[in-house]
Amino acid sequence: MEIHELQQLLSEMSLQEKIGQMVQLTGAYFDKEAVLTGVVGEQLPPEWIIQYAGSVLGVIGKDKIYDIQSRYMEQHPHHIPLLFMADVIHGCRTIAPIPLGQACSFHPELVSEAASIAASEASSEGLRATFSPMIDVSRDPRWGRMMESFGEDPYVNGIMGKAMVDGYQQKADTGIAACLKHFAGYGAVNAGREYNDVEISQRTFLEQYVKPFRMALKAKPAMVMTAFNAIDRKPISGNKELLKGLLRDKEGFEGTVISDWGSIGPVSYTHLRAHET
């Protein structure tokens, strides 16, 4: 669509429809036979959120995607299609080594080729975006996501991250949108515990944990994902200084900033920030 067509569409959308476009749900919410019980069932979003949701996580298989997309398009007032995304981390149908293993190759061209193959297979299934690459500098083996990173070196993370973004996005007909994650400092959480605070100096943060992003952003990834953690007791997902001041204004990122799985809620109830933050 042209810019003027998008502007016209936005002007015709209700507030609920615009909010819905910013919500991502799992495929279970669109499964006609699924019965959501327990905690998930108790936390079902309002019906209009499901009706106007903008994207879907983790549905694999072109037949499933086609079925959900067809039913969704029929009932959406503006027929805006869903965006299907998944964690295509180290391959889709053809599996490559985990990112930590790929880093050991010191071969960015090969890493880029593996990402290109994964993108081609994923796009043929109807997926349009992946939550990869993860370029968190990772030095604490207690942290449960070590294997998803390229290891302890900022430079290696940056080079391999850029290569992977190039591989995912380089082909217009078979490429998928890449997502750099997790901005920033996620690999330095205290004691390797998820959602924990990060307590490092500003210099270390910028020179070691932001550096890979600065390098990989040169490949122009479509998305950047925020980190679960807080730094200086400020949760990243609600940190204007980092997300706007550093990422957008200083580093020049013009793509989409996306939050991690359910990370908006913890801004208040995990990191104990005021609801007005």
Regions found by a protein language model. Name each.
Residues M1-A274:
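Glycoside hydrolase catalytic-domain context in secreted enzymes
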